[in-house]
Amino acid sequence: MTAPLPPPHPTLRACVIVPARDEEALVGSCIEALAEQDGISLEEYEVLLVLDRCTDATGNRALKVAAQHPGLRLHLLEGPGRGAGHARRVGMEEAYARLSSLERPEGLIASTDADTVVTPNWLSVQLAAAARGAKAIGGHIELRDDAGLPRGVSGWRAEQGRLRQRELHATLEPTGEGEPMRAEHWQFSGASLALTAATYKEIGGLEPRAALEDEYLELALLRRGVPIERPLAVRVATSARLVGRASRGLARDLALVSWVRSNTYDARDFGLDDLMSKKHASKTSISVVLPARQKDHGMDATLDALVSLTKAGLVDEVVVPCPESGPFPAGNGAKVYRDADLMPGFGPVRGYGDALWRGLSAAGGEIVLFLDPDAPDDRQAHRALGLLGPLLCWEDLRFVKGFSAEPADGQGSQALSELMARPLINLYHPELSGFVEPLSSEFAGRRALLASLPFPVGYGASLSLLLDAAQTVGVHALAQTRLGPCPATPVPLADLGEAAYAILTAATARTHGDKDLDDRAPGPLFLPFDGRFKSHRVAVEERPPLGSL
């Protein structure tokens, strides 16, 4: 529990808010930089450090550094423990109250972050801008210690900045002669932003949000017609870390782009001879599962394409679960099963995910590869190498999804990826938004992981396996491979609706919990087409992890 704050100093001109959660390692540099501000006396500003459910010595570390600067007024506040946005709001509300008590509407409410170091003139430049009439100010944010980022990440950030800058300039009204340029850069972030107390009151304060509160603050300013000045003279350097304290923000963006750069592969980079060497060195066994469906578009062609891999010894077995009423493919060395004979205690096969689950039960390989025989492709061996390559070359990878090199064409899983899966992922699981085709039916994984995951019996498995794998081993253990073009299989619109329903059901169970799903009790899918009204019961139940049986 923090002590009550003393009254503000009569000459107070600015309050600096610093939200912090477990920042013991970095907060010292932040406070040190704030203590050494030029062009302003220590009596004219104060620092409000908002401790947001810290479990380390963040507060003590900050106080220790502040003690080396006797004139610095550092006050500790308790945040609600609900994220950086809520903590920042606590600090801003306190700052507004303190400046208002002095009847100082022109006083500055400034914000930075505990992992950020401001320049020596950071405050004085902003106060000078406010004295000229600026109501809101965004600082320029640079990355420090970014040498460890994967190649291309810093370039991506710079390119995004240039695009944002052009968009910003297109929306700005021309400034009058002699007026300063309002947008010398594009940023307005919690790491460096400021607004006057009067402006804070005018927009109704900072919205209570766990993250991205700075973006919503910018929108609030725009709605009120409050111009934001973005001078390059206001600068800070923030951490280039990939694990942040907020659910959204710079660290998450850097982590996502770093993952895309580091964990996206191309099937052309993996040759048979090299993978054979990797397999022999690791003594890893490999199974391929080809779940046949009601219509056999390309099973025999796929089996023929895989012969070269089985003869070479890269693939140890090919497992083909077939529906009772479907065609029974020629062997070609494959182990062909009636899928009802696999795990018969669970009754008849209920759908796509159920077939995957039963195929996995018959596969003995330490790595299991799932290919889609319904999409005819004479390059299935090439695609198999692309999915197996990352798992054979990097032991820390556990799960790999494939994607086509061509853009989505509105067919099949590509359409569902764009219309259903991608919005869901970006909304609830943004760390996975780098997957190009999150619903791809071509994937590979280590059996130990796959056997620990539940399988929705229907098409929901296409997304649930990705979500569950990320939850179990982390996104760093997941990868994707560009497999090259593959013809999409047309899917009737009604079938896409059923698939979307199954995907949404599986995603809801993982996003909001099984209890929420049970309370909602998924019912039939109603289909009002051509003046008719019918219902279809979509299979949404789940098979238990094989490792639990």
Model-predicted segments: where are they?
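Terminal low-complexity segments of carbohydrate-biosynthetic enzymes
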Residues: 256-287, 293, 298-311, 328-331, ...
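A conserved acidic beta->alpha catalytic loop
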Residues: 33, 51-60, 81, 322-329
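Short, acidic, metal-binding catalytic loop of nucleotide-sugar glycosyltransferases
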Residues: 32-44, 304-315
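A recurrent flexible, glycine/aromatic-enriched loop bordering the glycosyltransferase active site
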Residues: 169-194, 406-414, 426-442
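Conserved donor nucleotide-binding strand/loop of the catalytic core
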Residues: 60-103, 329-354, 362
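Conserved donor NDP-sugar-binding/catalytic core segment of glycosyltransferases
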Residues: 121-157, 379-412
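A conserved hydrophobic helix/loop-capping motif in glycosyltransferases and polysaccharide synthases
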Residues: 12-26, 30, 37-38, 49-51, ...
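Acidic donor-binding loop at a coil-to-helix junction in glycosyltransferase catalytic cores
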Residues: 211-217, 459-467
